[in-house]
Amino acid sequence: MKFGKRIKEQIQESLPEWRDKFLRYKELKNLISSPAPVESIFVGLLNAEIDKFNAFFVEQEEDFIIHHKELQYRIQRLVEKCGHNDEMSRENISEIRKDIVNFHGEMVLLVNYSNINYTGLAKILKKYDKRTRGGLRSPFIQKVLHQPFFKTDLVSRLVREWETTMDAVDPVKVAEAEGYERCAAVTSAAAGEGIFRNTVAALLTMKEMRRGSSTYSAFSLPPLNISDSDNVLRSLHLSSPIPIP
């Protein structure tokens, strides 16, 4: 699949409020196709895009850190209260389970956001160099590697932590740990289909982009720093609303 089509589909699959935060790949491609693309205009547009990526990524990352702490507190309270009021425990476990799955999904989407925008920059720079016979790509990508939106280590670590937590908050496991038999009857709540679909699409896109080239280069994406997508999907304890290859 050509990248232009891939990023268009990814934007459509993304959360509505995220859709104007992605790389304006088609606009940049059209600029390159003009009779005499001006480097200063092209670089100015790229820098504006990077500023947009950084602002959005940092804002999301900060929100995730806050949400991470809030969810940890809620889980601690849930474990303390489990069994004292069975009906309340049942509702609380169901609610927090859904919140965790949604939170995990949003973080996966942010990692994918970083990946696909970086890939788009590398590809559009390659097209520019080919069109102008220039050498802009290599020095520009070196700058990109130090941008906040490219540094996904923190978010990837939180993704892995919450994959583990999703198992720990499995109602059956909570019941076994706390010794409350009635809590074991509580089933996991299904997360919203929309966020689940978006997360699945993001995971598959990340795998596809890394599979797209058989050779490693300075412009290749780093290894995927979250669990294999198939394992992530299984860890959700949910039936996928769309087929998973």
Swiss-Prot record:
The gene is SPX3. Induction: Up-regulated under phosphate starvation. CDD domains: SPX_AtSPX1_like. Pfam families: SPX (PF03105). Plays a positive role in plant adaptation to phosphate starvation and exerts negative feedback regulation of SPX1. This is SPX domain-containing protein 3. One of its GO terms (biological process) is cellular response to phosphate starvation. Residues 1-142 form the SPX domain. It comes from the Eukaryota.
